[in-house]
Each structure stands twice: as C-alpha cells, then as structure tokens.
Amino acid sequence: MAEREQRGGRDQRGGGRERKEREERDSEFVDKLVHINRVAKVVKGGKRFGFAALVVIGDQKGRAGFGHGKAREVPEAIRKATESAKRNLTRVSLREGRTLHHDIAGRHGAGRVYLRAAPAGTGIIAGGPMRAVFETLGVQDVVAKSIGSSNPYNMVRATFDALKHQDSPRSVAARRNIKVSTLQSRRIGGDAEAAAD
C-alpha cells in the first residue's frame, strides 16, 4: 500500500483518469483509410519491404486532418498515420452544418480539385479520397471534381488546400468591417438582379 501511495495513488495499470480522457477524445474522431501502399527500402542485403498508409480523420463537425505513416506491418503504419492526422487537424466552417459556403478550387502538385456548394439532399458527389475527406469532415452535400493527377496523396492535399481558402460570411464581414446581415442582404439583392436579367 505504501508503494502505491508513493506513485501518486495509481495502481499497476497506470493512466487512470488521463487514459480515460484520452480514449474519450479519440472516440469522437472517425477515421478512414484512404490508401495503403507497399514500399521498399534498398539495403546492403537486398530490399526491405514495408507499408505506407494514408489516413483521414475528422469529428464530422467541421474538423478534419490527414496523416501519412510508414512501418514494416500494416496495422502499425495505420496507427502512425492516424497519430499524424490527429496532430494535423484543420477546422472548416460549414454552411448550415452540411455544405460549403461557396465554390472553391485547390491544387497540389499536378492535382487540381473543384468543390461546389450544393442544395440539401444532393449528397456527396465525389470520388475516392475526396469522399473520405468530406465524410470525416461532416459535409453532407457537395459536388466535387478532380482534374489532373489522381494520386491519392495529391488529391487529399489539394482538397485540404481548397478547404483552407474557403471564407465564411462572418470572416468576410469582419475583413470588410460590416455586419453579416448587411453582407447577406447584398448577396440576396445581387441574386435577385441576376435572376431578373
């Protein structure tokens, strides 16, 4: 008993409350394995094979991130990629909690993506790696198109590049020193004029 008191009241399992908090924090995230690739390192005795994993995680409430991990075994590569993604989270503002505020484009290397806001009920119209990003982010309605490189790494990075360039009405209003209601009334007035033409 004296030994247990010296260690701060923790038993042999350790962790206690800290471990429980960490597990709760981890359980709020949804993770998707986007791509797994076999890689080789050439050493003096020949080739040493391993695996590289690309993982996207998010809380489905506007936070998402991606990570890359390499290891000799697949589960370890996925674990490393997930840890990397948790350190690399990005917050994205969503309109009505379901779609983007406006159309945006992003690029990385030879990969380009175009993302369009969509009305309710459209669903996620996107392929492969982009779909995983939107599902973990919590986007329910979006139309996405990729042009150029279909490399999953480039597509995920290009998608996050596009999402970083999105502006919410609140941030635009703050930049222009006007109220959000003024900005939205101008937008509605502009839409009515365009429809009349």
Curated annotation (Swiss-Prot):
Q: Name one GO cellular component term.
A: cytosolic small ribosomal subunit
Keyword RNA-binding applies:
yes
- The answer to keyword Ribonucleoprotein applying to this record is yes
Q: Which domain of life is it from?
A: Bacteria
Where the record annotates domain S5 DRBM, the positions are 29-92
Drop me one GO molecular function for this one.
structural constituent of ribosome
GO biological process: one example:
translation
- Note down the stretches annotated as region Disordered: 1-27
* Function of the molecule: With S4 and S12 plays an important role in translational accuracy.
Q: Which HAMAP family match?
A: Ribosomal_uS5_B
Family as reported in the entry's similarity comment? Belongs to the universal ribosomal protein uS5 family.
Matching entries from NCBIfam families are given as: rpsE_bact
The domain-related comment in the record is: The N-terminal domain interacts with the head of the 30S subunit; the C-terminal domain interacts with the body and contacts protein S4. The interaction surface between S4 and S5 is involved in control of translational fidelity.
The entry's protein name is Small ribosomal subunit protein uS5
Which organism does this sequence originate in? Bradyrhizobium diazoefficiens (strain JCM 10833 / BCRC 13528 / IAM 13628 / NBRC 14792 / USDA 110)
Classification lineage: Bacteria, Pseudomonadati, Pseudomonadota, Alphaproteobacteria, Hyphomicrobiales
